[in-house]
Amino acid sequence: MFGGRLRFKNKENAIVWIVNTHKELVNLVTVINGCLRTPKIIKFNDLIVWLNNKYHYNIPINSVDTSSLNSNGWLSGFIDADGGFKVRYTEKRVDVKTNKVLTKGRIEVRFALEQRKNIGTNINESYKPIMFQIHSFFGFLTDLRESKHNADQTYWIVEVSSLNRLNLLIQYLNNYPLLTAKRNDFEDWCKVYQLIVDNKHLSDDGKLLIKNIKSNMNKKREIFNWNHLIYLNKV
């Protein structure tokens, strides 16, 4: 679609897509110009200035896209990169001697999206505005939460567990599908979501099914389905 080449980073379990020919670069810039919502737009617009000056183009410089997140697939792409679909399955544990509950049983679905606080020291390089917009997308009226991975890494986090709020996400991702392997996790996560909505997660069969689904999600996944890539034909 855009050309370029792939570089495999085996140690990091990652693939890097590199676009470096002039034609491919200009094509990519033209397609995504006006669609950016994060502080990365600063470097992107610097690239446009360089292209315009170097090659006498007249590529327009746009500000951050502030349209509704429901209006396009940008959030879907952001989730593909950094979102997480989680299933919590905690079995009830009881002391056989005292009959005291040691651990309460709990089953829930959760969505989490984390992003570093900023990409520089300038206030315009903060991720807070876009993360707050995503936070508001789910109907939250409170301020953003922070998540610390260690002493020097602090992130903004949007975390959702309410079934009603998660339904907003499901509707959105049905309209703007995920395109990476994360689509597989989303579909399995939706199965657990529906079991909870239907109160089937409380039955022995439901618990067993959820346990099996969870065992093949995210980093534990061994079975992949790529049928969803058909959506690329609509791009």
Please place each PLM-identified region on the residue numbering.
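Internal intein/HINT superfamily modules and their associated LAGLIDADG
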Residues: 1-235
